Each structure stands twice: as C-alpha cells, then as structure tokens.
Amino acid sequence: MSEIIYTVVLIVLGLPMLLSIINYRPFFDWLQNSDLESWHETLPALINDRLDERRWGDMPGWLAALESLPDISVQYYDFSVGVTVGDATDITNEVRDQLQQSLMGLHPWRKGPFELFGLPIDTEWRSDWKWERVLPHLQPLKNRLILDVGCGNGYHCWRMLGAGAKRVIGIDPSAKFVFQFNAIKKYVGAEQPIDIL
C-alpha cells in the first residue's frame, strides 16, 4: 500500500523526477507508525491536490530551480543559532554561482535568514529576530512533536528542530514555500525529522 501512495503522489503531479526532489517517503513511513497513523491514508491525496501543477503556474520554474541545485556533500549544518548549512570552503566559486542562480529561481524568499555554504539567502523578513523574542516564552521543545501552521518556508521549523524537537511538521497554503523548504532539505537529507506539507 505504501508504494502505491508514493507513486500516486508522483503520477498526479505528472513529474517522476519529483521523488528525488521532494521526498515524503521518510515522513509517510514515520506517519504510518505514529499516533497520527489515521492521516496516512488521507494525507497523500491532500498533498497531491495542493501540489497539483495546474494550480501553480510558476511550478515548472520552481521545479527547474530545485533540479538545478548542485549536488554538494554537506559536512556541517546547524539550526540552533540560525539556519546554516555547509561552509564556504566546501564549494568552488563555480558551484557557488550555480547554487546562487538556482536559489534565485525560488525568489523572493520571505522568511529567513538562511545561509548555504557561506552564501546568504536574501529574505524579506528577519525571522531570526522573531525567534529570539518568542523563544524565552516557549516551553522546552526537546523531544516534542510540533505542528507549525502557517510555517511559510520553514525557517522556524528548522529552528525548532535545532532546539531539540523530535519531529516538526509545517503546513502552509503556498506551494512555493514547499519548494524553498526542500531547497534547504536537499542538503541536510530526507531522513531529517522535518517536513512541510
């Protein structure tokens, strides 16, 4: 049954390459064995509907941006102080240029800041400032299951994971944010317990 669900997601989107770009398999595997198991049967259809390319005229460009992201081996990432992935010394200038061009295909980025391999992603908002104001008022996030409704591109989701959350699930009505989030997740791995639906 699980294989059917994953295949349905790809067929409805009409994009077989999506499996390697937006990989929900670890999330669905976790979901099937969690207290939220009842969502395992219905959630794929909801995701299919939401990410149907007929609803989003810009989706081909977003897909192209994700597909063009260079493959880079990540030695380091940190979400506790900010959202930082890799180091500038991990990539050549040529790869940095390709990375920057790919990320520009997902602009504008609303929430941030993010830094990938020494390359800051220009964002409209400084969500780190909000995080610093909110954090002292939160109960400890260690080992918590978190649902972030209206998560945008997931900046605060990454910060919650960095604060020790067991799993973070974000939901937002904008498909573009799903693509921005997955540009970051490409480099930290699909197995990370964080997803945006």
Which residues does each predicted region cover?
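Conserved alpha-helix/loop element of class I SAM-dependent methyltransferases that forms part
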Residues: 125-142
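Conserved SAM/SAH-binding beta-strand->alpha-helix loop
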Residues: 174
